[in-house]
Every structure is written in structure tokens, then in C-alpha cells.
């Protein structure tokens, strides 16, 4: 049986939090089979990342979500492409340079909040989650929830990909530091079940 030449090529060998995994799948022949991408994490756990049909010799894949520190640890990861009996490997490193990667589901909640479908108290739980996970920090604990109405505009921009996670995270951090946003001491964050599948 003929085995095509295959290669997986990353656009970068290192990524920061908030950036999206971006790579090309190159095949010498389209066989009609699917390509399967596996990822091995920093402690050696291997899982299936993606299965995709191949219809041309070169396919670009950009992850729908950026890396965040809740799911993705700093360190080295390996990608393995399997296609029609052929295998190609490459690796990349996640580097914590201080950039902020906010979990993708917070953006979904932001859209609900900015459209008036979620009350401030519920959105504050998402902010509390970011504090609990040390994505942002809450130096002063207040007793009363305060989120200024104008902050919805910034959140709307971020939820619609008009500003980056780092810019939004830094804006949020500034508002907390300046006590413009106050999260009460008894505010509970969302419980996130650890997932065995990587979301990317």
C-alpha cells in the first residue's frame, strides 16, 4: 500500500497565553482519509486533538480559542499527525511572558452580559473565577458588588474580538486595583469540571 509523504508545520515554535495554535498539514497525495492530530502535554499525556478531512495537499488549521493558563501549562508539547499510514511530529512550547489568556467560556458569558441577558452578579462569578485561577488578582475584598455600566463597552469589544485577552485582562486588573470593580468576599466562582479533552 502506498504511503504518502506528510508533514505538520507550525507557524511558531513557541506560543504565549492568549495566542492560538496555528499550523499547516502538508500531504503529497489526497487519499480520501481523515488526518488525525494527537497532542502530548507537558507531563506525557497523549490525547486526540482533532480529526479533519483532507481535500487538498496543503491545509491550514487555526485553533478557535487561544491558550489559557487554566487548561494549558507552561512547557513543551508535541503534535503528531497521522494520515494514511504516515506520521509526522513537531513540538512547540507555551511560554508565560505575562500575556493573559482568558478561558473561552468567559467570552460566551461576556456576550450574554453585554446584551443584557445576564445580571451583573452572574458576570461577577466569571470575574471571580479569573481571580481564583490567578489570571487576575483581587487585592482588596469588598462587601458590595460593583461593576460600572460603562465597562460593558470594553467587554463587548473583547467578546467580539476587537481587543486581545491581554488588553481586556489588564483593563479588568486596573479596575480592580483602583477599586472601580469590587467583588464581594462571599462571591462564589463557577465550578469548572476538569476536562480530559483539550479544547483548542
Regions found by a protein language model. Give the residues of each.
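Short, aromatic- and glycine-rich surface loops/edge beta-strands on solvent-exposed regions
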Residues: 37, 72-86
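Fold-core signature of tandem repeat domains
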Residues: 105-113, 118, 123-131, 136, ...
